[in-house]
Amino acid sequence: MFEPTAIYAPNPHRYDTMTYNRAGTSGLKLPAVSLGFWHNFGDITPFDQMKSLVFTAFDNGITHFDLANNYGPEPGQAEKNCGLLLAKYFRHHRDELVISTKAGYEMWAGPYGLSLIHISEP
C-alpha cells in the first residue's frame, strides 16, 4: 500500500514549550493550539505539504488534530488523508495524539448519507 519510507523521528523536546490544559473534568489534557484539517488536507493539497504541516505541528507539541466529515475539498477527503498520515508516519505515536471529528454534513444523497451506520463505520 505504501512505499517504504524512513521512520519519522519527532522532536524529542516537543512537550517542553507547549501549554496543555485539562478538558473539563475528564482528565484529558489538550494542547493550547490544535491543528485543524479543514482546508489544507483535501485533494488539491500535495501530500508532502500535508505531511510537512503535520510534522511541524507534532514537533511543536500539537497533539490534537481536528477533523469533520465534510473537510476537504472534496468533502471527506481530510479524514481519509489524516488516516493515511497516521498509518504511514504516526503508527508508533498514535497513543500521543487526540483525533476529534464531527458529524452532521450529509455526505451523499439518499437515506444513508447521514445515517448512524455512515457515522460509525471505520
Feature map (PLM): residue ranges:
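Residue-level detector of conserved catalytic or cofactor/ligand-binding positions
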Residues: 115-122
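N-terminal binding-site loop/beta-alpha segment at the start of enzyme catalytic domains
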Residues: 1-98, 107
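Active-site-proximal loop and beta-strand segments within enzyme catalytic domains
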Residues: 108-114
